[in-house]
Amino acid sequence: MLDSLKQKKNFQRIKMRIKTGDLVKVINGKDKGKTGEVLKTIPLENRVVVKGINLRTKHVKPTQEGETGRILTEEASLHASNVMFFSKDKNLTSKIEYFIDKQGVKKRRLKKTGEVID
């Protein structure tokens, strides 16, 4: 899969600072302003799946006789550049930076406030 992505004309892999379980706010697109938890990250495609955001409807036909068709609603992925980390405590969005603490452990913090995430 990585080889096929590299063959694309504009392939650019960016280090994702957003991780699964983070609370993010959508900053661009039809769901702009909504917040949700990251369910899944797709680093090779620079995309994230956020709970309750970018919902898509899928119509499923019956596969066996006697079974009824159904309509499924599921979250589609968003590009990572369209979401930003959201701090509940301060009620603001911020970029994330990495730093090494006094014990030599690499951690993340908010650039605006300096609040340590993990």
From Swiss-Prot:
Keyword hit for RNA-binding: yes
GO biological process annotation, one example: translation
Keywords from the named record: Ribonucleoprotein, Ribosomal protein, RNA-binding, rRNA-binding
GO terms for cellular component: ribonucleoprotein complex; ribosome
MF (Gene Ontology): rRNA binding; structural constituent of ribosome
Pfam family, any one: KOW
Disulfide bonds: none
HAMAP family: Ribosomal_uL24_B
Job description of the protein: One of two assembly initiator proteins, it binds directly to the 5'-end of the 23S rRNA, where it nucleates assembly of the 50S subunit.
Subunit note: Part of the 50S ribosomal subunit.
The family this protein is said to belong to: Belongs to the universal ribosomal protein uL24 family.
Protein name (Swiss-Prot/TrEMBL): Large ribosomal subunit protein uL24
Protein species of origin: Prochlorococcus marinus (strain MIT 9312)
Organism classification: Bacteria, Bacillati, Cyanobacteriota, Cyanophyceae, Synechococcales
